[in-house]
Amino acid sequence: IAFMANAQHLTYRSDILDQLGIAAPTTYEEMLEAAGRIRSSGLMQNPVGGAYAAGWNLAEEFVNMYIGHGGEFFKPGTAEIAVNNQHGYDTLNMMKQLSHFMNPDYLTHDSNATSAEWKAGNVALMNMWGSRIGALKGDEVDAAVVKTKSSWFISSRFCLYSL
């Protein structure tokens, strides 16, 4: 029984982007460019967060991005798996590129650890579940992030539903 519809949203620190004159990303390529500029500026070493923990977290990230790349899981009209294709390759490549801007322990980071990185002020860009956004603005958020409560923004440009 479905109990919740959820969506991933691009979440970003507008204070960091504004400080560097970076427009809010609208594509993963722009997200990579923004991450590179943030790292080069010295503001953050690992500006991208992601729930890439080995297991279902990593699989869910692949599934959502694969669908976003236009991938189909099965050959039309069959039960034959069809992820070994250009869409699958593009998805894995983009995930790899994003991981270069993540905490070196990214394969241990689930949604909880990724949220903790955000709350500590260590991350400026990440996809996060809509159901977790409220907690990112909660009372236990680092003072550097709290001061941006009114200026940070959640974009649904990368939004994909998962039931």
Task: Name each region found by the language model.
Residues 26-33, 105-120:
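Short helix-initiation/N-cap motifs at beta->coil->alpha
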Residues 34-37, 77-108, 149:
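Glycine-centered hinge/linker elements that transmit conformational signals in sensory
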Residues 14-26, 100-103:
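Aromatic-glycine-rich donor-binding/catalytic loop that engages nucleotide-sugar donors
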Residues 111, 128-133, 154:
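Beta->alpha turn/N-cap motifs
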Residues 16-17, 36-41, 112-126:
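Short helices/loops that flank or line small-molecule/ion binding pockets
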Residues 1-17, 46, 151-152, 157-162:
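A structural signal for short loop-to-beta-strand junctions that line the ligand-binding cleft
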Residues 1-3, 8, 32-80, 87, ...:
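Extracytoplasmic/periplasmic solute-binding protein
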Residues 52, 69-90, 138-147, 152, ...:
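Short, solvent-exposed loop/beta-turn-alpha elements that line the ligand-binding surface or hinge
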